């Protein structure tokens, strides 16, 4: 039989096949090979009626996220709050960079707009991200049509309203939520496992919240590729290995001077580039000590 893993919990993998859910375990050979099944995996499995089944094979994956562990994702809704916690340009860009690097299409959803007096400021932000090529929405009626026939991950900083949004989309789920802590300005984690839910003709994952992001990006070339607007311009740079910082004939620096690209995004690029270089220098020092 073939199916898709829709939930992983306490060593069990729940596989959906032909409208039925089967409780399965992974064969021991997966552990020996270090090839663990994840939510989103297409698998071959065996199962008898009213008995526990076993995963026999895992199909090739098209992409993956490490944290949360989920694979074969079509798109990700990055939920960023307008307030409580306050809107964070830098954090949003870091989510987008992660998704670009992982070849997952992002959708930006602005939550908690009811706490704003007006949306004028964010309409300007929306235009900037739309100019890059991203969906940027803050109404459910704009989001729901984008979910059909897709596997969609919901992700964002803790406390931005992921679970609340899912409960609005599908009240029958009744997922647990918690309010923001006044002292910390962040929410408590309420999502304990990665689970795929059937909603609006697609599958949606509510994932554990994040306070920080880990990257596999280790070079300026990889970072450049994670910024669509910089990648497009970099073909016109004088030097192929241009870092868009000090090199002559840099098309990105020219576009920045002409205000054709958003300076806030460029500043995020410079910050992360500096972090990459600092990690590289730290690694070199460690190697010298050895």
Curated annotation (Swiss-Prot):
Superkingdom: Bacteria
Domain CP-type G: 62-213
Binding positions (GTP): 111-114, 156-164
Cofactor, how bound (note): Binds 1 zinc ion per subunit.
CC cofactor: Zn(2+)
E.C. number(s) listed in UniProt: 3.6.1.-
Compartment(s): Cytoplasm
InterPro entries: G_CP_dom, NA-bd_OB-fold, P-loop_NTPase, Ribosome_biogen_GTPase_RsgA, RsgA_GTPase_dom, RsgA_N
Main localization, broad class: cytoplasm
One GO location term (cellular component): cytoplasm
Purpose: One of several proteins that assist in the late maturation steps of the functional core of the 30S ribosomal subunit. Helps release RbfA from mature subunits. May play a role in the assembly of ribosomal proteins into the subunit. Circularly permuted GTPase that catalyzes slow GTP hydrolysis, GTPase activity is stimulated by the 30S ribosomal subunit.
NCBIfam families found in the cross-reference section: ribosome small subunit-dependent GTPase A
Family that this chain belongs to: Belongs to the TRAFAC class YlqF/YawG GTPase family. RsgA subfamily.
Subunit structure: Monomer. Associates with 30S ribosomal subunit, binds 16S rRNA.
Name by which UniProt lists this protein: Small ribosomal subunit biogenesis GTPase RsgA
Upper classification of the organism: Bacteria, Bacillati, Bacillota, Bacilli, Lactobacillales
């Amino acid at each position: 039989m073939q199916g898709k893993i829709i939930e992983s919990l306490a060593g069990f993998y729940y596989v959906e096949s032909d409208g039925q859910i089967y409780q399965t375990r992974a064969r021991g050979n997966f552990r020996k090979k270090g090839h663990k099944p994840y939510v989103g995996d297409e698998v071959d499995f065996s199962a008898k009626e009213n008995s526990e089944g076993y995963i026999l094979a895992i199909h090739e994956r098209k992409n993956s996220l490490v944290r949360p562990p989920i694979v074969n994702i079509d798109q990700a809704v990055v939920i960023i709050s307008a307030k409580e916690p306050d809107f964070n340009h830098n954090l949003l860009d870091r989510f987008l960079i992660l998704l670009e690097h992982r070849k997952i299409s992002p959708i930006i959803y602005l939550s908690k707009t009811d706490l704003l007096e007006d949306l004028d400021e964010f309409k300007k932000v929306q235009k900037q991200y739309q100019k890059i090529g991203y969906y940027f929405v803050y109404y459910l009626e704009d989001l729901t049509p984008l979910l059909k026939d897709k596997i969609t991950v919901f992700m964002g900083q803790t406390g931005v309203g992921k679970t609340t949004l899912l409960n609005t989309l599908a009240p029958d789920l009744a997922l647990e939520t918690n309010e923001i802590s006044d002292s910390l300005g962040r929410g408590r984690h309420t999502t304990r496992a990665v689970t795929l839910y059937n909603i609006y003709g697609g599958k949606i994952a509510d994932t554990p919240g994040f306070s920080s992001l880990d990257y596999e990006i280790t070079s300026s070339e990889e970072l450049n590729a994670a910024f669509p607007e910089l990648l497009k311009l970099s073909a016109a740079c004088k030097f192929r290995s241009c870092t868009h910082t000090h090199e002559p004939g840099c098309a990105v620096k020219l576009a920045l001077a002409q205000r054709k690209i958003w300076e806030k995004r460029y500043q995020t690029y410079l910050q992360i580039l500096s972090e990459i270089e600092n990690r590289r220098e730290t690694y070199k020092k460690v190697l010298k000590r050895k």
